[in-house]
Amino acid sequence: IQKDGTYSVVPRMWGGLTTPDELRAIADVADRFRIPTVKVTGGQRIDLLGVKKEDLPAVWAQLNAAGLVSGFAYAKGLRTVKTCVGSDWCRFGTQDAMGLGVKLERLLCGSWTPAKVKLAVSGCPRNCAEATVKDVGIIGVDSGYEIHFAGAAGLHVRATDLLGHVDTDEAALEHVA
């Protein structure tokens, strides 16, 4: 619930990725329900702000019909897996950050945790997904991935601790999931 008594609706976008059809569905919902603010979040999602309580069931029904599910933006648990474009699109990318991020988010979605958990996968040491200030961060390097833990980007910024190095996507998933 927002400070004016309206609600925020944040559909999940696995690894920060979306499609033209999903974007059209979000735009259609914003138009149909006269949602006053549509904002891209720091977690690479789209937040529909100012949704009236009585519209929530219909908003979610329309989004669900388009294949969109809740991003659990305010839940205690897995928030998002932020990704950079990685080796698919970036000239510096050494690893497939988007692919690994989507796998990781799907694997962990619905997990219960005592507090919010933010994750990121960067495709190279340039760290465009800000993996070193997340609870769990994975950074692509030439020989695989570095696994990082215990970062924070809130009031008390803290860089992660390096846990170690793994060679493959599967090993990265095994170590963090």
Language-model regions, residue ranges each:
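Small-residue-enriched alpha-helical segments and adjacent helix-cap loops
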Residues: V9-D142
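Mobile "lid/hinge" segments at catalytic clefts and subdomain interfaces of large enzymes
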Residues: K118, G123, N127, T132-A177
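Intrinsically disordered, low-complexity polar/charged tails and linkers
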Residues: I1-T6, T18
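Short, flexible, solvent-exposed loop/turn segments with mixed acidic/basic and small polar residues
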Residues: I1-K3, R34-V40, A153
